[in-house]
From Swiss-Prot:
Name of encoding gene: miaA
Protein name: tRNA dimethylallyltransferase
The keyword Transferase appears for this protein: yes
Subunit (UniProt): Monomer.
Cofactor: Mg(2+)
Source species: Cronobacter sakazakii (strain ATCC BAA-894)
EC number: 2.5.1.75
Lineage start: Bacteria, Pseudomonadati, Pseudomonadota, Gammaproteobacteria, Enterobacterales
């Protein structure tokens, strides 16, 4: 398999999909038969000490197929799409320099988009404006601020849930700083990706099956010690619910349980529901994605063969 395309650009492979869709298993198999190196594209897997609730590949899987961009920051640190793009481009260049092909696998669609299309220059955070937004939220509630965003930027308001204060605050902040909406600014893409990319999306054909998998996996996480993992983070004392790490699906629900805000059963219910909602958002992103080849996760042999056929590799 040639690692340079007919266009003269180096090849890269994107393997995208919702949570619990079998991405990791397929990526590991491809790693065993193709000259590829794996790069994780997941905003939760970057955090150290967050292994069970993120379904991070285990030691055995990583010994078969090492992943770059896993365990690179502490949960107290921030990691943006711009940080990811910088780190992924560096990793891709190193992989190509070694004569291999980058295989990027994960479910953080914003990261894939940032890598593929580049990032528009958004204004830096302004603590004064951020504080004013927080003050208004305390007085009027986040629902009122969501209605305000609907007037300013209806496209962003449709995408951002009223219960997501972090993204809601940022959308308003960008407008108050720049006078331009988040939608306007993000339509101006930055530098495109200098690779010929083969894009794949893997998911079960049935939504019910995906929901069933999500529920099973959440219970497996609990049986594997997820509560103890989050309890250790909770006990640190320097983490709080405004941080992206604590807001990860599953973690924020367990955090609420440990804080005494909800019962154990409610935590399980909310955790499963939140994971299903995440999967729905991921699939919605992918349905609007251009140039993607769909793979059925319930037919792993066929999915594997389809990837090889599209990228022009011989069946192993």
């Amino acid at each position: 398999m040639n690692d340079v395309s007919k266009t003269g650009l180096p090849k890269a492979i994107f393997l995208m999909g919702p949570t619990a869709s079998g991405k990791t298993a397929l990526a590991i198999r491809l790693r065993q038969t193709l000259p590829v190196e794996l790069i994780s594209v997941d905003s939760a897997l970057v955090y150290k000490g967050m292994d069970i609730g993120t379904a991070k590949p285990d030691a055995h899987e990583l010994s078969q197929a090492p992943h770059r961009l896993l365990d690179i920051i502490d949960p107290a640190q921030a990691y943006s799409a711009a940080d990811f793009r910088r780190d992924a481009l560096q990793a891709m260049a190193e992989i190509v320099a070694a004569g291999r092909i980058p295989l990027l696998v994960g479910g953080t669609m914003l990261y894939f988009k940032a890598l593929l299309e580049g990032l528009s220059p958004l204004p830096s955070a302004d603590p004064t404006i951020r504080a004013e937004i927080e003050r208004q939220a305390a007085e009027q509630g986040w629902d009122a601020l969501h209605r305000k965003l609907q007037d300013i930027d209806p496209v962003a308001a449709q995408r951002i849930h009223p219960n997501d204060p972090q993204r809601l605050s940022r959308a308003l902040e960008v407008f108050f700083i720049s006078g331009k909406t988040l939608t306007e600014l993000t339509q101006t893409s930055g530098e495109a990706l200098p690779y010929q990319v083969h894009q794949f999306a893997i998911a079960p054909a049935s939504r019910e099956l995906l929901h069933q998998r999500i529920e099973q996996r959440f219970h497996q996480m609990l049986a594997s010690g997820f509560e103890a993992e989050v309890r250790a983070l909770f006990a640190r004392g320097d983490l709080h619910t405004d941080m992206p790490s604590v807001r990860c699906v599953g973690y924020r629900q367990m955090w609420s349980y440990l804080a005494g805000e909800i019962s154990y059963d409610e935590m399980v219910y909310r955790g499963i529901c939140a994971t299903r909602q995440l999967a729905k958002r991921q699939i919605t992103w992918l349905r609007g994605w251009e140039g993607v080849h769909w793979l059925d996760s319930e037919k792993p042999e066929q999915a594997y063969s389809d990837v090889l056929q599209v990228i022009g590799a011989k069946q192993q």
